Regions:
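Residues within well-ordered beta-strands of beta-sheet-rich folds
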Residues: 115, 125, 374, 429-431
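Extracellular carbohydrate-recognition regions
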Residues: 357-391
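Extracellular/lumenal carbohydrate-interaction signature centered on repeated Trp-anchored short motifs
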Residues: 94-104, 413-430
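Cell-envelope and extracellular/periplasmic
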Residues: 4-358
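Short, solvent-exposed loop/turn elements at domain surfaces
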Residues: 33-38, 279, 382-388, 412
């Protein structure tokens, strides 16, 4: 990618804080987050940038560092504040006094590759929401709190699940920090743990239902979304490592194949299996991330079962891949999807026009978002969409929901919401 010189905007020096942010959400499972086992390099390859921030989740910016609160805007580095905390899984050769803690992810590097293309007074605000080992068809649901987000044991994606509540709540929070902020893209990397389940074929429909719900839940913030619509925000869906395709060939075609050829829906698949020469993209397998002792670098080869991210090493991309091919291709996909608009071509901040009904927030503390909760046959079983039934049963058959009530009982369908007080005080509309 070639850098673009932008005219008509103030030049921002190294110590300047951005006036506003393009928001990039990072969601999915382990290959979307800091699972690269090679030594972090915060003084060189993994150096932070003052224009790249993240939403906080942990109580300190770095282990033992400055205090922060949930959803604060803090500096982004190589080990972001995802649902799963990788900050204590230190490399045995790490010098913690130099900030070489935890593992390496690609979020910082995606943002670095986008910086040359955005106005100089803007930054990138990353919203990390990944959880290793998470799936749509298996895994513990965990819990969600508006004060702390999804619990670390949350491992199930789907409409209404704690991981989804975390995703939508943090995305809203990032936009509400500043009425100038714009949701640019969602980088999604998920599917491995669904492939290992007998119910893997359900993953594509469950993903689509969640995608539709995410966009519906953000309609009240359309003005702060790319191109003025949550439906226009691209979902950039990344590939997985060669191990998964070699081990689960049929399942791979079903799960990852369902991300392909959906550009008309704003869903873009990004292949990572091999590089431009057809060589497998490097993983945490020791032979693929060796030590370079004379250069002072130690790879995944130096980790043991006391500190590796996973015992099955080729299931995760290496630190080098997360600095190179993965952010290269993800950032390019984002620019191909959103970069050919006036905001990028002119190098000026996009104009935020209030959505019909005046849903654009006027300040950080205002949330006038529209909550849309749906039950649609096309989106799969009711339970998968976050609904639960009492004193009865509900079953999807031939595109129709069939409800059977218990004798002498009155059945009810319920769905959790993340802001029950607003629903109670402001009311809503029911459409059948």
């Amino acid at each position: 990618m070639q850098a673009v010189a932008i005219e008509g905007e103030p030049q921002v020096g190294p110590s300047s804080e951005p006036d506003w942010y393009y928001v990039v959400v990072l969601a999915g499972q382990s290959n979307g987050m800091a699972y690269g086992e090679g030594l972090p390099l915060p003084d060189s390859y993994d150096a932070p940038d003052p224009r790249i921030k993240q939403l906080a989740r942990r109580s300190t910016v770095t282990p033992g560092g400055e205090s922060c609160a949930y959803n604060d805007i803090i500096p982004a580095d190589h080990c972001l504040h995802d649902v799963q905390d990788m900050s204590t899984l230190n490399h045995p050769k790490a010098d913690l006094s130099k900030g070489q803690y935890g593992c390496v992810g690609q979020g910082l590097h995606i943002a670095k590759k986008l910086l040359p293309y955005i106005p100089n007074n803007a930054g990138i605000l990353l919203v990390p929401c990944c959880r290793g080992g998470s799936a749509f068809t298996q895994g513990a649901e965990g819990t969600f709190s508006a004060a702390t987000g999804a619990s670390q044991d949350s491992a199930r994606w789907g409409v209404g699940k704690p991981l989804y509540q975390d995703l939508i709540a943090r995305t809203r929070a990032a936009l509400q920090k500043n009425p100038k902020n714009v949701l640019l893209a969602v980088c999604w990397m998920q599917g491995e743990f669904d492939m290992s389940a007998a119910t893997y074929a359900q993953q594509p429909a469950l993903f689509t239902a969640m995608l539709k719900q995410f966009r519906a839940d953000l309609t009240g913030l359309n003005a702060q979304c790319h191109n003025g619509s949550a439906a226009a925000v691209p979902w950039i869906c990344g590939d997985t490592t060669y191990y998964w395709k070699n081990t689960y060939g049929t399942q791979y075609d079903t799960v990852y194949g369902a991300y392909k050829n959906r550009e008309s829906e704003g869903v873009y698949f990004v292949p990572f299996m091999t590089d431009g020469n057809g060589v497998n993209t490097a993983t945490n397998a020791p032979a693929e991330d060796p030590d370079i002792v004379n250069a002072g670098y130690y790879g995944s080869a130096s980790r043991t079962n006391k500190n590796w991210a996973s015992s099955n090493r080729p299931t995760h991309f290496s630190s080098w891949a997360r600095r190179g091919i993965i952010p290269d291709r993800l950032a390019t996909a984002i620019l191909n999807a959103v970069g050919r608009t006036s905001a990028f071509i002119t190098g000026k901040a996009p104009e935020i026009k209030p959505s019909p009904g005046g849903d654009t927030p006027s300040g950080p503390s205002v949330d006038t978002s529209v909550r849309t909760i749906s039950l649609q046959p096309a989106a799969g079983e009711a339970a998968a969409q976050g609904w639960s039934i009492k004193d009865g049963s509900i079953q999807l058959s031939e595109g129709v929901f069939k409800i059977t009530k218990q004798n002498n009982k009155t059945w009810s369908l319920t769905h959790p919401v993340d802001d029950a007080v607003s629903l109670l005080t402001q009311g809503g509309r029911l459409t059948c």
